[in-house]
Regions:
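N-terminal leader/linker segments that initiate helical-solenoid repeat arrays
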Residues: 10, 15-101, 428-450, 460
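Solenoid-like repeat scaffolds
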Residues: 51-59, 82-93, 104-107, 116-126, ...
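TPR repeat positional signature
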Residues: 65, 94, 99, 131-134, ...
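Structural register within alpha-helical repeat arrays
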Residues: 68, 99-102, 134, 165-167, ...
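Residue at a conserved register position within TPR or TPR-like alpha-solenoid repeats
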Residues: 72, 138, 169-171, 223, ...
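Structural motif corresponding to the intra-repeat A-B loop/turn of tetratricopeptide repeats
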Residues: 75, 105, 141, 172-176, ...
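Catalytic glycan-binding domains that act on GlcNAc-containing polysaccharides
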Residues: 91-93, 100, 115-121, 294-304, ...
Length: 682
């Protein structure tokens, strides 16, 4: 079937009468998971998950002794923890949970030989969560024989681990420090690794005859770039006099960034970076853009990309599209989120502003080939389809739209489905039938049961981030939908919806399978004026349905309300000012009322969602800078979303919209599901 993106290009939304909304910006912050809070009843009924048989449900009950064992471990009372574990219904599992928590909290207290023995005999434990912590705990005091044995079991994944392995082999005379190959490797690892001060001093003392002036210069540079000027200053005292002036200048700039302008002429990359970073906070103009264009970084690519991101956005605002494109080039990145970001923006600017689809394809294709997660895959595939469509290659456009449409939980996957199916009803939980089949063995399923139970007890003990990380391991076991639904059912049945939601998010993004249990619907919304799908989508994105969630910025509850916003709404709704923090019903009432007010003000779903995340003040600025999405076609609205300067808000708008589509299908199963296009038009 041909895809007809052009059929939407002239559409625009209908504006509603606007009334004033609460103009309270909502600063964001990282969720804080491990602080104790008083639990209140949540306004949710018991969930109903269809198509799950009794055999597929995890048949676990609460064991107070397992909970006690974890509690004692948190207090560092190992004897009591082991005693409680022995009293439990499953002593082997309970003792494993104790050990997992000990490794997570402080692996340096456990001998490497014991860590190896534990992981070998408990192969269900998601070791990739703990290996970096274990490596980071290794130091000069670690027994070199144990260290070498450990790295025989788990080869080092960090420069720190590689350095200490080489150091141990040198100490054990398994590596000859007199050989240039060993000396070169040691120097390279030291130059690119940060240690604590006492470790650095031991390294210098032991290997001072190995390190060269070039090593010192590169190590000083590394430390300065990584915000450790204190030890860099100590190292500078070892430099010959002719190298000290530049090192002194860089150290001064590191401590006093505002002085960077004095040393611009030194042509040093760090000084130029600091100068331009300072400028980005006060004066982003043509000179700033020109200066950035002239620099092709030799390292620290992610830091430079953040600056270039600011520069190309300003160039777009000035309609200097070529300069904007130039700033996306020579980024030096090879993988990861920043790489995907840089390649996508290069392709997007080439396609939408320079009208050069061939250049765009040259960016979107490597993005698709070098990313793994559904969000990035679907985004690259969708824009490849648009680029091929613009190049009048309908066959390849159709191919890439179909590729993108596999990722049914994502914004761009849903856009591709809308293009291919029009108004035809689509069950997003069907997805790719091949992906629904389990590729796992019985051993994988047995591992999953233990992982599910471990996450359950850790979450209840307020180790929420650790529980989420453990849940994120499950999709790697290649389970089918039935097995994933069973795990979600277990969490929902025990009122731990956040873990069911996290499992759903991870499954959708890593194994591309959507599960119904990850989309809770039975939340009481009182006096709602907008589709219930919106409120549920916001709750899912804000808190994972965790009514005790709070962020470092102070946002609280299911809808992550900020204190100022909640206080203003409390007066209007005649509720206590602090009720949003402890009463889930009040939190939902205030949050849904705020969304209603925002929609009443803007008459547009995109602006409403963006304002809920970033505040109405920012949204007003963006409308002035980038245009009014209420007067735009669908593709222009998509471009408007991608123009939002805050990455969190950009992603937030897309996430809420994609959640709305799924919820709309679940809440109104009797009629054709509204495609994401329809929600973009609201």
């Amino acid at each position: 079937m041909a895809f007809g993106i052009t059929c939407y290009l002239c559409m625009s939304c209908v504006c509603l009468d606007a009334t004033a909304a609460v103009d309270t910006a909502k600063p964001r912050g990282k969720n804080i998971h491990n602080k104790k809070q008083t639990s209140k009843s949540i306004p949710l009924n018991k969930p109903v998950i269809q198509n799950i048989t009794k055999q597929e449900v995890y048949n676990f009950g609460d064991d107070p002794n397992i909970a006690a064992a974890i509690s004692f471990t948190m207090k560092d009372d190992l004897a009591s923890a082991v005693a409680a574990a022995e009293r439990s219904g499953d002593p082997e599992f309970a003792k494993a949970a104790v050990e997992v928590l000990r490794i997570y909290n402080n692996p340096s207290k456990i001998a490497l030989t014991k860590l190896e023995a534990f992981l070998k005999t408990h192969n269900w434990v998601p070791e990739e969560i703990f290996i970096p912590k274990i490596e980071n705990s290794i130091n000069y005091a670690t027994n070199p024989d144990e260290l070498v044995q450990w790295f025989d079991y788990k080869p080092p994944g960090t420069n720190r681990g590689k350095f200490f392995l080489l150091n141990a082999n040198i100490r054990l005379r398994k590596a000859d420090i007199s050989k240039e190959e060993i000396r070169s490797k040691l120097r390279s690892l030291w130059r690119s690794t940060e240690f604590d001060s006492s470790t650095e001093e031991k390294i210098i003392s032991e290997y001072k005859d190995v390190f060269t002036v070039d090593d010192l210069l590169k190590k000083i540079d590394f430390l300065i770039w990584n915000n450790n000027p204190a030890f860099a200053q100590k190292l500078a005292t070892f430099l010959p006099s002719k190298y000290r002036p530049l090192a002194t200048s860089k150290l001064e700039v590191a401590k006093h960034p505002e002085r960077a302008y004095k040393y611009w002429g030194s042509n040093d990359e760090f000084i130029k970076y600091i100068y331009l970073r300072n400028l980005s906070k006060t004066k982003v103009d043509k000179n700033f853009i020109k200066s950035l264009e002239s620099i092709q970084p030799k390292g620290n690519y992610e830091k430079w990309w953040k600056l270039k991101n600011i520069g190309f956005r300003e160039a777009l605002n000035n309609k200097d599209f070529q300069a904007a494109y130039n700033l996306t080039q020579h980024h030096g990145l090879e993988a990861g989120a920043a790489f995907a970001d840089a390649e996508w923006y290069g392709g997007w600017i080439a396609l939408e502003f320079l009208k050069n689809p061939d250049k765009a394809i040259a960016h979107f294709l490597p993005m698709y080939e070098n990313t793994k997660l559904a969000n990035s895959k679907s985004k690259a595939a969708y824009w490849l389809a648009r680029a091929y469509f613009a190049a009048k290659n309908l066959e390849k456009a159709t191919f890439w739209y179909k590729k993108a449409s596999m990722y049914t939980s994502t914004f761009y996957g849903q856009l591709s489905l809308a293009e291919s199916r029009g108004g035809v009803r689509y069950n997003y939980f069907d997805g790719n039938q091949e992906l629904n089949k389990s590729l796992s063995t019985q051993a994988d399923k047995d591992k999953t049961k233990k992982i599910v139970l471990l996450a359950y007890y850790l979450f209840k003990a307020n180790y929420k981030m650790l529980a989420y990380n453990i849940i994120d391991h499950i999709p790697k076991l290649h389970l089918g939908r039935v097995d994933l639904e069973a795990a979600a059912f277990f969490f929902n049945k025990r009122d731990l919806r956040p873990l069911a939601v996290e499992l759903g998010k991870s499954s959708a993004n890593r194994s591309f399978i959507l599960i119904k249990g990850a989309y809770p619907t039975n939340v009481r919304i009182v006096n709602s004026k907008l589709p219930k799908a919106l409120y549920l989508a916001v709750i899912r994105q804000e808190s994972n349905f965790d009514h005790l969630a709070f962020s470092s910025a102070g946002a609280r509850g299911l809808m992550q309300l900020m204190p100022k916003t909640a206080s203003v709404l409390a007066s209007k709704l005649r509720l206590p000012k602090d009720a949003y923090a402890y009463d889930p019903n009040a939190n939902i009432l205030k949050g849904s009322t705020y969304l209603d007010q925002l929609y009443s003000q803007y008459g547009n779903m995109i602006l409403t969602i963006a304002a809920y995340n970033a505040g109405p003040g920012n949204v007003q600025k963006w409308v002035k800078l980038f245009g009014d999405p209420r007067k735009m076609s669908v593709i222009q609205k998509i471009n408007w979303i991608e123009t939002i300067p805050f990455s969190e808000t950009r992603n937030y708008v897309k996430k809420v919209l994609e959640n709305m589509v799924i919820y709309d299908m679940m809440l109104v199963p009797s009629h054709n599901t509204r495609s994401i296009i329809k929600f973009l038009e609201l």
